[in-house]
Amino acid sequence: MWYSIYCEDKKNSLDLRMKTRESHLEKLKLLLDQGRILIAGPCPAIDNEDPGEHGFTGSLIVAKFPSIQEAKEWAKNDPYYIAGVFESVTVKPFKKVFP
């Protein structure tokens, strides 16, 4: 089943986010290579794809997992979570309708 993983960043976490970015992307690439990512990316803090020093407010990942528990475990093992970038993480079942 698909699960949405919404991660809210801690304030002023941009430097930590950027230091941890490569390992975070490597973890996502494993899911991508397995065909398990529907969409993934950060949420800019301003209305611009490149927010610069304004940074990001969080991230959204919609990916396929065998269960919600496995989705939560995956999120807890994300390098951003481990490094302390995220204030909170919410995992919910997701039903794809379009496209």
Regions found by a protein language model. Name each.
Residues 1-99:
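Conserved, structured core segments of small domains
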